[in-house]
Amino acid sequence: MEKFKGYLQKGGFKQQHFLYPLLFQEYIYALAHDQGLNVNASTFNEPPEISGYGNKYSSLLVKRLITRIYQQNSFIYSVNNSKQNRFVGHNKNFYYKMISEGFAIVVEIPFSLRLVSSRKEKKEITKSQNLRSIHSLFPFLEDKFSHLNYVSDILIPYPVHLEILVQILQCWIQDVPTLHLLRLIFHDYHNGSNSITPNKSSYGFSKDNPRLYRFLYNSYVVECESIFDFLRKSSSYLRSTSFGPLLERTHFYGKMKHIGVTCCNDFQKTLWLFKDPFMHYVRYQGKCIMASKGTHLLMKKWKSYFVNLWQCHFHFWSQPSRIHINQFPHFSFYFLGYLSSVPINPSSAKSKMLENSFLIVTFTPKFETMISIIPMIGSLAKAKFCNLSGNPISKPAWADLSDSDIIDRFGRIYRNLSHYYSGSSKKQSLYRIKYILRLSCARTLARKHKSTVRAFLQRLGSEFFEEFFMEEDKVLSLILPRTSYPLHQLSREPIWYLDIIRINDLVNHFDL
């Protein structure tokens, strides 16, 4: 980031908020491809005679690409000039792909610089490495959700109109040429589509340039949450003094505090309708959860607020059925691969007063997380480890590997799943997953050696797999002191790790 600031100050771009000239800097494209500055021009898929700079990145090539983007149908030339023009035959999407890769780096600079400057002003840089873990959310839910009454499971709506995204970025990027280029990339790259949707064209866009796609999606979510947070803090009895909720940690790791929000004159008259001192909000993937200790009427008001926000501010229709209001403890929801609920658990205590004894039974809610075995089996079946009934099958694609590589792959998958699901309140489902993976591994090895599973296991012994399928309690016994907790009690308690920064690929197969 200091390197970025040096380039900006040297070129005089920082004071004027100009980002467009950075598109012509060679180091931007080196960073986009995660390579050094002395990489040859093959990164641009062009020969050196076109780039004009031999074995270095060419700003001349970038200028030519941008010029051809602005000139409609400029890539169509006559056959007579094809020998002199090396650009003939390129698809127009090639130009957008090359420019958008550098554009994704450039548009992140204002956000990153403001984040660094805000941290320096506070002079307190907290170590948030542990907060980046996915498991860091669950202790928060355990502490808060057990005292709440209602929860709303909200599906963040789409599509997002492309012009709305440009207007959102306009509050941060005060560079008109950059915004014009962004509009051109949007409308031409999407072949006339005016919105980002989860269809095939949007998938291709996210596949070609996932960095820019995630940046645009995060910008849209920041706008939604900033307005919601403004209303929540303005209506709350216990107003917070800082704004620091966690973002999706992709290329920028915080939110800015100063958000410009336009309010109408009678806005304060309606704030009392939303006063709730116990409102909690958590977002994950394309969904969010809003829980409250208030009444059902209050949750319906928040639901109406979200629907009107998406329709009036973002200009697209949002169906009220996207927001489901449910009451604890009669509700379970999928959250990051876990089936979460807040059941009421009874506990009894015997009390004696004089000659009379009493049995006191108390009911306390407790946040629980469990593994939903049916979606997990479906995920394993999709990955070709078993069929839809949960019966293990061989993995023919891995039969050409060595025995140690096959066992290592199966063992690594199980250890990763066991590590991710260590927070489950009931770990019996892990034994079912272990059974499927172990037998699938044995059948893959038997298929490779043209033998039966029974004969293969009798020849090598069941201890052959123990080294590769080390259970979580065995790992804990090596890490924790023997006198800290009983091992059987520790294996039943949820354990949250602070080193998990991504969801397991098999968990991603769930229809969340």
From Swiss-Prot:
It comes from the Eukaryota. Usually encoded in the trnK tRNA gene intron. Probably assists in splicing its own and other chloroplast group II introns. It is found in: Plastid, Chloroplast. GO terms for biological process: mRNA processing; RNA splicing; tRNA processing. Keywords: Chloroplast, mRNA processing, Plastid, RNA-binding, tRNA processing. It comes from Lemna trisulca. This is Maturase K. Coiled coil: none annotated. GO terms for cellular component: chloroplast. Belongs to the intron maturase 2 family. MatK subfamily. The gene is matK. GO terms for molecular function: RNA binding. It holds the Pfam family MatK_N. The keyword Plastid applies.
